[in-house]
């Protein structure tokens, strides 16, 4: 009788656990890191990530990594054409290194999210010969009946492969063979694979790639079987109703089974922070909807959107840190991009610590979301107080009852007076920042910009610069010719555009700057910053006008008093008698003196 009771209890617990698998935890206060970008083979090596486990785990609760299965090569392969499901040698390291990394992060309280690619596969030696694999007493076999009959628009059949699966239940993918999810064999193999990822390799959850490629209800079936703690789908669409429809479509046993990336918010972020259309932040998104914010994974950029426009990207080129401050103050689960983490690490640490100090979660209430002509005001309610974020140029916001927690270009984040900011204030050091080549000079009152051209742009670089009233580059495309001012250590040429004090009337609805290879190819429309240093990736930083040998890019020198001096990486150098003494005696470099940044040239 006792054994029967124990068995029934175990079965009941199993059923309850399955029933609670609802895509993403409710009231979740975690922050996620996308631990890779396109071709990040060095930065995302399993050993490289593991070496940073202590630092990363202090900020992030989940880290999303690339698809780790073997793709018949370990060279320049991101994993999006999977071949082997149970062999995890990859361009990022060995399977042993992967297992060790996952275990190390788990010991520090951080889970690893696997990029799961089950819309399509690649063959082992030809288009369709998926390998037979064994795991846990099960053998996975495949036939041509497991591939959609209309795969690759009929090209697969036309090339002699008699695929006999059903028609695709979603969008076609031309790069690999689309799996027929209506087939029981396909679904059984996928369930075995997902179980292996969780129970054998130790992954904590799934990021499903290209979920537009098959019907949403299959995600519900797979997650009900595998029971991941975390699941998020890449439903790449700016229409919030379509993304909500996909989330609802994952329901199984009456419950939603997966979150989704908030692409509607991503496009609103691009317009607001990239073009000054602040009202877009008040538009409908997953995170702004109380009914769906639990299932919203918000982001500024990812490995796909962060690529150049000609490669299908939709990158944010300006005010990137301010945009990260926005997602870290909103409901939803924020996912920080590795490139942004590397560039703005210390500021992001402070923003994340502030989010946790206030007690913001994926289901926090939005108290206020209001646009003005030059900025946006956001107020959200956490479990320990309120967060008040001022974006752009907001000068009339009421901050009585709030204390300033973090500030930077185009943003100020306040929290309720009673919130404990000890953890935020304990984070020392400054961001890696940007240092332009020494040959980049800006004269007082000069209107100019610099462009580091790609190596294959061989013509004279031209510039097209405008605002809502005027064009400053002649008014005829491709604009004004730039002057080559130097070559970087990497061998790329840097060009400078300087305004010649003539302008033509313009009726543009925005303002910006474009550089081109004498017309084509060209950059995207980039936000104009006077003295800005640009690449095809966007604005890297601003070169300040040269006045003396010692400049302070952030603020003028305060009155003389003894203040601590730190290097840019946070190392204390001592307490000089006053700032003037420090600036005269320190070697060339960037220093933090009295919480302000100074450049000694």
What feature does the model see in each segment?
Residues 6-15:
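Bacterial N-terminal signal peptides
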Residues 22-38, 48-57, 67-69, 74-81, ...:
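Active-site-proximal helices and loops of the catalytic beta/alpha 8
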Residues 93-134:
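Substrate-binding cleft of carbohydrate-active enzyme catalytic domains
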Residues 454-505, 520-525:
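Aromatic-rich carbohydrate-binding modules that target alpha-glucans
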Residues 74-83, 120-162, 224-225:
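Aromatic- and acidic-residue-enriched segments that line the glycan-binding/catalytic groove
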């Amino acid at each position: 009788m006792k054994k029967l009771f124990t068995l029934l209890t175990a079965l009941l617990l199993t059923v309850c656990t399955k029933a609670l698998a609802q895509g993403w935890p409710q009231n979740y206060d975690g922050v996620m890191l996308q631990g890779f970008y396109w071709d990040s083979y060095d930065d995302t090596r399993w050993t490289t990530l593991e070496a940073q486990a202590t630092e990363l785990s202090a900020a992030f609760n989940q880290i999303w990594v690339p698809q780790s299965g073997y793709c018949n090569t370990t060279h320049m392969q991101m994993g999006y054409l999977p071949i082997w499901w149970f062999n995890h040698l990859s361009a990022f390291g060995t399977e042993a290194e992967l297992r060790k990394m996952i275990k190390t992060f788990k010991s520090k309280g951080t889970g690893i999210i696997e990029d799961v690619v089950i819309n399509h596969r690649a063959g082992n030696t030809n288009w369709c010969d998926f390998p037979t694999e064994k795991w846990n007493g099960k053998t996975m076999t495949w036939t041509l009946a497991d591939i959609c009959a209309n795969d690759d628009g009929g090209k697969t059949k036309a090339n002699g492969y008699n695929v006999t699966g059903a028609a695709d239940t979603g969008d076609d993918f031309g790069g690999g063979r689309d799996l027929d999810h209506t087939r029981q064999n396909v679904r059984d193999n996928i369930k075995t694979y997902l179980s292996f990822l969780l129970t054998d390799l130790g992954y904590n959850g799934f990021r499903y790639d290209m979920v537009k490629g098959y019907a949403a209800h299959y995600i519900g079936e797979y997650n009900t079987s595998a029971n991941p703690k975390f699941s998020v789908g890449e439903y790449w669409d700016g229409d919030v109703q379509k993304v909500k429809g996909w989330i609802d479509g994952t329901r199984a046993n009456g419950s939603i089974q997966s979150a989704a990336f908030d692409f509607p918010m991503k496009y609103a972020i691009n317009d607001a922070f990239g073009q000054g259309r602040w009202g877009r932040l008040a538009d409908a998104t997953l995170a702004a909807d109380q009914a769906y914010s639990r299932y919203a994974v918000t982001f500024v950029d990812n490995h796909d959107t962060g690529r150049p426009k000609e490669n299908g990207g939709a990158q944010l080129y300006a005010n990137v840190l301010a945009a990260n401050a926005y997602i870290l103050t909103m409901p939803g689960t924020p996912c920080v991009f590795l490139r942004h983490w590397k560039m703005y690490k210390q500021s992001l640490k402070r923003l994340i610590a502030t989010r946790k100090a206030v007690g913001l979660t994926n289901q926090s209430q939005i108290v206020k979301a209001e646009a003005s002509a030059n900025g946006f005001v956001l107020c959200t309610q956490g479990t320990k107080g309120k967060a008040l974020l001022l974006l752009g140029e907001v000068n009339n916001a009421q901050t009585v009852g709030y204390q300033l927690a973090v500030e930077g270009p185009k943003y100020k984040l306040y929290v309720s007076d009673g919130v404990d900011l000890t953890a935020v204030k304990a984070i020392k050091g400054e961001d890696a920042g940007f240092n332009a080549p020494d040959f980049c000079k800006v004269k007082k009152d000069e209107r100019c910009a610099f462009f580091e051209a790609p190596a294959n742009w061989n013509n004279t670089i031209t510039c097209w610069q405008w605002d809502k009233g005027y064009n400053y580059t002649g008014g005829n495309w491709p604009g004004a010719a730039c002057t080559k001012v130097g070559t970087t250590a990497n061998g790329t040429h840097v060009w400078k555009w300087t305004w010649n004090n003539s302008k033509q009337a313009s009726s543009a609805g925005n303002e910006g700057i474009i550089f081109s290879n004498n017309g084509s190819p060209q950059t995207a429309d980039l936000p104009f910053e006077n003295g800005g240093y640009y690449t095809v990736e966007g604005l890297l930083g601003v070169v300040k006008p040269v006045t003396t040998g010692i400049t302070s890019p952030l603020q003028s020198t305060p009155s003389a008093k003894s203040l601590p001096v730190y290097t840019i990486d946070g190392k204390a150098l001592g307490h000089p008698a006053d700032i003037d003494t420090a600036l005269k005696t320190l070697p060339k470099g960037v220093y933090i003196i009295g919480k302000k940044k100074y450049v000694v040239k």
